[in-house]
Amino acid sequence: MPLKELIDRDWQELESEGVLFSSLEKLVAWGRSNSLWPATFGLACCAIEMMSSTNARNDMSRFGSEVFRASPRQADVMIVAGRLSKKMAPVMRRVYDQMPDPKWVISMGACASSGGMFNNYAVVQNVDSVVPVDIFVPGCPPRPEALIYAVMQLQKKVRGEAFDQLGQQLPMVDAWTRELR
């Protein structure tokens, strides 16, 4: 009997007995997607909405993000909430560099995403020019529900279940590096 048929038969027997097969990478991605720990980086009025996303009504803890970390070494998600001044940009980059891999960034609000409604010389026009952003949340300020939706989209991205507007599956972020496969 060929080796492939023997292995297929053994797998079928194990599956019929209730043994579950999966890759370790998918298991790690599933665990990571359900325990995203955000770093507090509130800069303006969007930070108030970010704080209200953890209250009893919105309950962000349903998605494993209930504990906002004060130390970047314990966080894997940075939520940039509000406008980023040019003097604060190097500090934000340093905080991002101190976060362990893998790490993700959510840009929350019009100021963080595009510099805000006013073209001010002292404000960075796009947080993406300082750190790589994974999810943009529109609004001025965005409601807590929008931030929770962004966390849910980030969970899908971490698990490799994210799709673009054309229905194409986006590449899964490798569990150990920032590179895409």
UniProtKB/Swiss-Prot annotation:
Its main location: membrane. Binds 1 [4Fe-4S] cluster. [4Fe-4S] cluster binds at residues 45-46, 111, 140. Pfam families: Oxidored_q6 (PF01058). It is a peripheral membrane protein. PROSITE patterns: COMPLEX1_20K. HAMAP family: NDH1_NuoB. NDH-1 shuttles electrons from NADH, via FMN and iron-sulfur (Fe-S) centers, to quinones in the respiratory chain. The immediate electron acceptor for the enzyme in this species is believed to be a menaquinone. Couples the redox reaction to proton translocation (for every two electrons transferred, four hydrogen ions are translocated across the cytoplasmic membrane), and thus conserves the redox energy in a proton gradient. This is NADH-quinone oxidoreductase subunit B. It comes from Deinococcus radiodurans (strain ATCC 13939 / DSM 20539 / JCM 16871 / CCUG 27074 / LMG 4051 / NBRC 15346 / NCIMB 9279 / VKM B-1422 / R1). The lineage of its organism: Bacteria, Thermotogati, Deinococcota, Deinococci, Deinococcales. The gene is nuoB.
